[in-house]
C-alpha cells in the first residue's frame, strides 16, 4: 500500500545562511548605520535572537530575517515569535524559536483534519511525524493538497513516499 510521512523539519544550514545574509543586509542598510542591531543564531536552542535600539527597528529586523528565510526555502511560519519584546537597558530583543517536529497536539489536529476529509486513507502518529497510508496514490495526493491548504500555523514537508 502506498504511504508517505508528514514531517516538519528545518535545514539548519539554510537557517545559518539566511542569518548570515540578513546580517549582511543589515550592514548595507542606511537606516541601521551606527545602530547596535544584530542577529544571533543559537543552534542548540534552535532560536534566533534579534537585538536593536527600538521596538520598531526589531520589527524591521524580523522582516529582513523573514525575507532571507523565504529566499532560502524556509517558510515564515517556521518562526515562533513571542508577542512581547524583552527590554534591557537601551536595547529591545526578541528570541524567535524555530519550529521543528510535530507536537502531539498539532499531530492530533492533522490526523483529525485528514479523517474529516472522508478520503480512504489512514493516518497515524509516529513520534514527531504522521504516517499516511492508502490504497490509491490519488488519495494520498489529495491528502497532500489538503495539508498544504490547511492553515495549522506550521510548515509541513512530505517525505518517504512509498508505492
Curated annotation (Swiss-Prot):
InterPro entries: DUF520 (IPR007551), UPF0234-like_C (IPR035571), UPF0234_N (IPR035570), YajQ-like_sf (IPR036183). One of its GO terms (molecular function) is nucleotide binding. GO terms for cellular component: cytosol. It comes from the Bacteria. Pfam families: DUF520 (PF04461). Keywords: Nucleotide-binding. PANTHER family: UPF0234 PROTEIN YAJQ (PTHR30476:SF0). Belongs to the YajQ family. Nucleotide-binding protein. This is Nucleotide-binding protein YPO3170. It comes from Yersinia pestis.
